[in-house]
């Protein structure tokens, strides 16, 4: 239970009580007194059915009252089952932070309030940042705990089908189509399918790989996750407490198989999604699936979720003379390990995570490696620097930490990451100085916001150093600039100074095309234009077309690391469930005023 004598608890209780009273009054004077002039409100489906952030008290006070009148929020109290209100530092500012709960006419939610003194108003504590997040829909709660299935359908009738019979029937889709078709069986596909399963929404995952988890299993031999285990749980099923801090790719792949079985997810392997079209009148898709035996199946789901990840179609740039090269050329997505290249000469083009890891793997296998840098790259040591952004996950519950992560509005997150970036640069100073002496071109992200914002804005452009940078500094791995190549020849890369970097292998660690290209390939140019830009931050200060409605009704996108997918899948699933239950119009656009 909370210590009600604690100053933080009293302050949070007082503010929430005044907030609820102010929302019920038509006059906004009382409400205005509760918000700091420099304040932020992030609403995740709770009051607006949108995922959006508003900056400044004026913008908040304009939007909040009409939304509150329609959605009728009430019951704002500090949640006694969550982390107690406390004094924290966020984005360089001291604040009182409290987790609260509330409900609306359609659901129940959680939120985070941060209070700071307003020096222009007698140091009165006011809201600096406010999160309101929808947690569940009334009458359609997740089938967990006391809501779990009883199992009577198969455990009490000795003449009827047993559990296995029913599972086979459910996954077979012999005489029905799924409500939701998920394309891709990685962490994003599994996360959204698991969420929808708990909301009783019929969902099928299709993936072209032969085995569940192959999207990780088939990646390069030495790969492990670059962030720590406590950040990377899938929904509902935590990793065992004896798992390593950094999970090997094959271990994660095998966990995906176990997860599908344990969560009873319907999953078709060796199934290619060939394309789909949307019938606006019927409000459903017509999609074509090609199975492993070559047969085709047409389905009519009401929703399609593209869960193929941030990295979609490999990007293979045009490089002068590369077609004349007599050795082996492959994209990094095709690379397995360096065993066959012992004693050989290898060129790796690209200095992101994959390029560095592949160069290190080749060198460790006995190859002679030269890396070519195409553009400046952010480098950060995997420990402790790269893990600083995940510091909150080292304490408290996963549920609380996910909510805290969700609660940070973009502008405060930027400031926080700039501060973290400065700390990382100081910790890594010797390494970074050595790289610059070796001729490596460094950057620190847009406005020095560090690696995570590089990921959120462009999906790459950084490296977590697990040893390759040290090899470059020592000269074990040669480094050259891609701009200094004149052309490739049969022997290798001929430089502008007339020398040649001879090679037997060229690995193109050149990244992936934008997700818009995959949307166009699968659904056509008209739908691609309707959806628009994917990933990166839009004017609403949110990731564009991620975890929310897009410009194309019935088409949803989910991508990101395991933590992003765990959090974002909850928001996406609630929207689909709301549509299926008539709480949200089926054809509403991403930013419609629909409360």
Residue ranges of predicted features:
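Short, low-complexity N-terminal intrinsically disordered segments enriched in polar/charged residues
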Residues: 1-37, 167-177
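A solvent-exposed, acidic/Ser-Thr-rich amphipathic alpha-helical stretch
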Residues: 11, 21, 25-92
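N-terminal Rossmann-like dinucleotide/flavin-binding domain of flavoprotein oxidoreductases
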Residues: 57-103, 222-292, 458-478
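Short beta-strand edge/turn micro-motifs at domain boundaries
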Residues: 99-168
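Flavin (primarily FAD) cofactor-binding/catalytic cores of flavoenzymes
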Residues: 133, 178, 201, 206-208, ...
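A short, basic/flexible loop-to-alpha-helix module at the beginning of a structural domain
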Residues: 153-178, 330-342
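Glycine-rich Rossmann-fold phosphate-binding loop(s) that bind the pyrophosphate
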Residues: 183-190, 208, 351-352
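Conserved N-terminal glycine-rich FAD pyrophosphate-binding loop of Rossmann-like flavoproteins
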Residues: 210-238, 377-401
């Amino acid at each position: 239970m909370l210590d009600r004598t604690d100053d933080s608890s009293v302050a949070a209780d007082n503010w929430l009580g005044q907030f609820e009273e102010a929302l019920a009054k038509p006059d906004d004077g009382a409400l205005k007194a509760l918000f700091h002039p420099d304040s932020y409100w992030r609403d995740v489906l709770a009051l607006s059915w949108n995922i959006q952030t508003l900056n400044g008290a004026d913008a908040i006070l304009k939007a909040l009252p009409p939304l509150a009148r329609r959605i009728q929020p009430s019951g704002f109290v500090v949640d006694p089952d969550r982390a107690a209100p406390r004094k924290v530092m966020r984005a360089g500012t001291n604040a009182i932070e409290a987790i609260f709960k509330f409900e609306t006419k359609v659901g129940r939610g959680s939120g985070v309030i941060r209070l700071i003194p307003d020096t222009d108003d007698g140091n009165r504590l006011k809201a600096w940042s406010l999160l309101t997040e929808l947690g569940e829909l009334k009458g359609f709660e997740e089938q967990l705990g006391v809501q779990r299935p009883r199992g009577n359908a198969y455990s009490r009738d000795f003449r009827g089908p047993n559990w296995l019979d029913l599972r086979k029937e459910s996954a077979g889709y012999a005489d029905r189509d799924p409500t939701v078709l998920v394309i891709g069986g990685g962490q994003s596909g599994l996360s959204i399918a698991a969420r929808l399963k708990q909301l009783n929404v019929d969902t099928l995952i299709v993936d072209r790989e032969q085995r569940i988890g192959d999207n990780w299993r088939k990646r390069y031999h030495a790969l492990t996750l670059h962030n720590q285990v406590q950040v990377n749980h899938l929904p509902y099923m935590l990793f065992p407490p004896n798992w390593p801090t950094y999970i090997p790719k094959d271990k994660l792949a095998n966990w995906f198989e176990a997860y599908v079985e344990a969560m009873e997810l319907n999953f078709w392997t060796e199934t290619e999604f060939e394309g789909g079209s949307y019938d606006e009148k019927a409000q459903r898709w017509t999609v074509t699936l090609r199975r492993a035996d070559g047969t085709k199946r047409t389905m009519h789901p009401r929703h399609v979720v593209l869960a193929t990840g941030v990295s979609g179609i490999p990007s293979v740039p045009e490089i002068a003379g590369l077609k004349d090269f007599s050795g082996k050329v492959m994209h990094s997505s095709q690379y397995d390990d360096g065993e066959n290249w012992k004693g050989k000469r290898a060129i790796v083009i690209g200095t992101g995570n994959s390029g560095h890891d592949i160069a290190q793997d080749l060198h460790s296998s006995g190859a002679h490696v030269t890396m070519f840098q195409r553009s400046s790259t952010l480098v950060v040591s995997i420990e402790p620097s790269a893990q600083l952004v995940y510091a909150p996950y080292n304490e408290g519950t996963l549920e609380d930490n996910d909510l805290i992560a969700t609660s940070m509005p973009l502008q405060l997150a930027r400031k926080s990451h700039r501060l973290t970036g400065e700390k990382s640069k100081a910790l890594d100073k010797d390494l970074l100085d050595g790289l610059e002496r070796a001729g490596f071109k460094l950057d620190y992200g847009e406005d020095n916001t560090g690696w995570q914002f590089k990921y959120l804005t462009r999906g790459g452009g950084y490296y977590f150093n697990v040893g390759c940078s040290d090899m470059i500094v020592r000269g074990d791995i040669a480094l050259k600039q891609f701009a200094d190549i004149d052309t490739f020849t049969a022997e290798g890369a001929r430089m502008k100074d007339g020398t040649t970097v001879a090679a037997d292998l060229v690995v193109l660690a050149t990244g992936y095309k934008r997700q818009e290209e995959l949307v166009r390939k699968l659904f056509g140019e008209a739908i691609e234009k309707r959806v628009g830009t994917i990933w990166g931050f839009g004017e609403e200060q949110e990731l564009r077309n991620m975890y929310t409605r897009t410009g194309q009704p019935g088409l949803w996108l989910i991508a990101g690391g395991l933590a992003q997918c765990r959090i974002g899948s909850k928001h996406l699933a609630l929207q689909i469930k709301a549509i299926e239950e008539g709480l949200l119009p089926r054809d509403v656009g991403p930013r419609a005023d629909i409360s």
